[in-house]
Amino acid sequence: TIMANLATLGGHVEIGEWVNIGGGVVVHQFVKIGEQSLIGGGFCAKQDIPPYIIVAGHPLRFIGINKIGLERRGYSSEARLLIKKAYREYFISKKNRGQALAIIKNNFKHSEEIEKIINFIESSNRGIV
């Protein structure tokens, strides 16, 4: 995990492996940050950030998957594409997030990455960005 200068964590924050937290980021207490995710500099994380994504903006929002980080860690192009499709369904489709999660659970190939995404979202207590 990489934390740039002035990044601040509240109490009981959970951070997955290979996370990149930009400079000046403030993470609220009890927030969970999923593995391989990246938070753009200068923003505030008040809700949980699922694995494998890039988030930025005020309020913090999904920007895309952490493609470069996943490539560097050796994820296959098939795994990256599946992650991208799952998050496109969850964040970008016109469905509400409950419906989108059900589609991911029922219609997507259940790889290790998809299972981590599903488990992370279902176990979120603070909501998802």
Language model regions located:
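Terminal amphipathic alpha-helical/low-complexity segments used for targeting or macromolecular assembly
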Residues: 58-129
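Structural signal for interior beta-strand "rungs" in well-ordered beta-sheet cores
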Residues: 1-56, 60-61
